[in-house]
UniProtKB/Swiss-Prot annotation:
EC category: transferase
Sorted UniProt keywords: Cytoplasm, Schiff base, Thiamine biosynthesis, Transferase
Binding site for 1-deoxy-D-xylulose 5-phosphate: G167, A193, G194, N215, T216
Region spans: Disordered: 245-265
GO biological process per UniProt: thiamine diphosphate biosynthetic process
Protein's gene: thiG
The name this protein goes by in its record: Thiazole synthase
Family recorded in the similarity comment: Belongs to the ThiG family.
Active site positions: K106 (schiff-base intermediate with dxp)
Species whose genome carries this gene: Methylobacterium sp. (strain 4-46)
Pathway(s) the chain acts in: Cofactor biosynthesis; thiamine diphosphate biosynthesis
Xref: Gene3D superfamilies: Aldolase class I
Any one of the GO CC terms: cytoplasm
Enzymatic reactions: [ThiS sulfur-carrier protein]-C-terminal-Gly-aminoethanethioate + 2-iminoacetate + 1-deoxy-D-xylulose 5-phosphate = [ThiS sulfur-carrier protein]-C-terminal Gly-Gly + 2-[(2R,5Z)-2-carboxy-4-methylthiazol-5(2H)-ylidene]ethyl phosphate + 2 H2O + H(+)
């Protein structure tokens, strides 16, 4: 007997990545919080099922780290942060699979240290090699529809275009590109990087993103736990608004109340 796919809390279809249904469309990072205890509380407040973790902060002997033990029950998405070549990213992914027992990997291959822009050629090559090695690959990339299409063609389980520069808090810098990517992509689009506050997450979801991944916006907020809760509601609101359909923009007013029967008419 087939187990029914669980619906999200609002009755929406769940996010599905590589055949795995997820109730939350928010993915959250675990770096940069004031304390590990605040990190764990914020992750729980966000409602996220997936937490990203840098393999550099996880024991390779299999004993785990504070992050892993504090977030028991969550699905971990290790990343290749700090890698600058496909070779390094593949090696880091192999270490992550050994340390965490997961084939899921967020590929980050940085091409410029000042802007933290991804290296497109190396990201494509890392994705190709890791897909061939049996990984579930979620690559971080620039907001280029062609690059996202190439990554999907290579077998990426989702694509993760940047909203804006990592840690910048500038929100969605290129909504036209992002909307095009979301409309065309055959795999889920997860907006990654640049989210600064809840309204940024709403915009990303309204443009058609399947999910949002964020870290700094919560970790560096004055109250990370409260911001995590805000992000949870923002992602849900943006998803609902996208499905509901916004009214067209007009350059003129249009009354919402009927004009018939007005006094003096």
């Amino acid at each position: 007997m087939t187990t029914p796919t669980p619906l999200a809390p609002d009755g929406d279809d769940p996010l599905v990545i590589a055949g795995t249904p997820l109730r939350s469309r928010l993915l959250i990072g675990t770096a940069g919080y004031p304390t590990q205890a605040i990190m764990a509380e914020a992750v729980r407040a966000s409602g996220a099922e997936i937490a990203t973790v840098s393999i550099r902060r996880v024991s390779l002997r299999g004993h785990g780290s504070d992050t892993v033990s504090l977030l028991a029950g969550h699905r971990f998405l290790p990343n290749t942060a700090g890698c600058e070549t496909a070779r390094d990213a593949v090696m880091t992914a192999e270490l992550a699979r050994e340390a965490l027992g997961t084939a899921w990997i967020k590929v980050e291959v940085i091409g410029d240290r000042e802007t933290l822009y991804p290296d497109v050629a190396e990201t494509l090559e890392a994705t190709r090699q890791l897909v061939d090695a049996g990984f579930v690959v979620l690559p971080y990339c620039n907001d280029d529809p062609v690059v996202c299409a190439r990554l999907a063609d290579l077998g990426a389980a989702a694509v993760m275009p940047m909203g804006s520069l990592i840690g910048s808090g500038m929100g969605v810098a290129n909504p036209a590109n992002l909307e095009l990517i979301c409309r065309r992509s055959p795999v889920p689009v997860i907006v990654d990087a640049g989210i600064g506050t809840a309204s940024d997450a709403v915009i990303a979801m309204e443009l058609g993103a399947a999910a949002v991944l964020l870290n700094t916006a919560v970790a560096k907020a004055d109250d990370p736990v409260r911001m995590a809760r805000a992000m949870r509601h923002a992602v849900e609101a943006g998803r609902l608004a996208h499905g509901a359909g916004r009214i067209p923009r007009r350059a003129r007013a249009e009354p919402s109340s009927p004009q018939l029967g007005l006094v003096g008419s």
